[in-house]
């Protein structure tokens, strides 16, 4: 088991953190997943438990008409990958509204959900499960958030700055 897998397991099984800050934690998972819009709400992960947690947190908080689909497939290097998606457009709009977004995508990040440092840490923990990797500190300490949109990256930079965590922004080739 890799160091990143151990960290993700520790976070995803921290029931106290999740229960106290469920909305902020969920917001981090959903906003920083693969997609968060009226057209598509989804995430992919190699961790089955994280995929189940993503779907569970949606159902626990938001009244849904249809379903959230979790698919298992062989990804890169024959690694099992789980894709979770919200199937119905009305359900996606309901989820967006729950987190203070509109269906047109005018509001990309809702900073109101991150009112204090505990909510910010919960958001970062959720985001970590959806889009991050961390290297073993015994070798080379490096934490990476891979975010889809510039506004989400701006929110992440603001949060890290407010929490006095050092970071640097880099744009991967071909991702401009």
Protein language model regions, located:
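N-terminal, positively charged regions that mediate nucleic acid binding
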Residues: 1-40, 44-54, 58
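DNA-contacting interfaces and partner/effector-binding or oligomerization modules
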Residues: 45, 52, 57-76, 81-176
């Amino acid at each position: 088991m890799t160091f990143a897998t151990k960290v993700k397991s520790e976070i995803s099984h921290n029931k106290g953190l999740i229960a106290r800050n469920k909305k902020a934690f969920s917001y981090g998972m959903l906003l920083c997943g693969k997609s968060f819009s009226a057209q598509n709400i989804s995430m992919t992960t190699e961790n089955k438990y994280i995929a189940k947690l993503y779907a569970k947190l949606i159902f626990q908080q938001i009244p849904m008409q249809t379903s959230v689909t979790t698919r298992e497939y062989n990804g890169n290097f024959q690694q099992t990958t789980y894709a979770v998606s919200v199937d119905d457009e009305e359900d996606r709009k309901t989820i967006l509204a729950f987190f203070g977004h509109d269906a047109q995508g005018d509001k990309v990040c809702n900073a109101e959900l991150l009112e204090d440092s505990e909510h910010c840490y919960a958001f970062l923990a959720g985001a970590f499960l959806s889009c991050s990797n961390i290297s073993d500190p015994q070798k080379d300490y490096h934490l990476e958030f891979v975010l889809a949109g510039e506004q989400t990256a701006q929110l992440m930079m603001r949060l890290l700055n407010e929490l006095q965590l050092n970071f640097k922004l880099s744009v991967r080739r071909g991702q401009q």
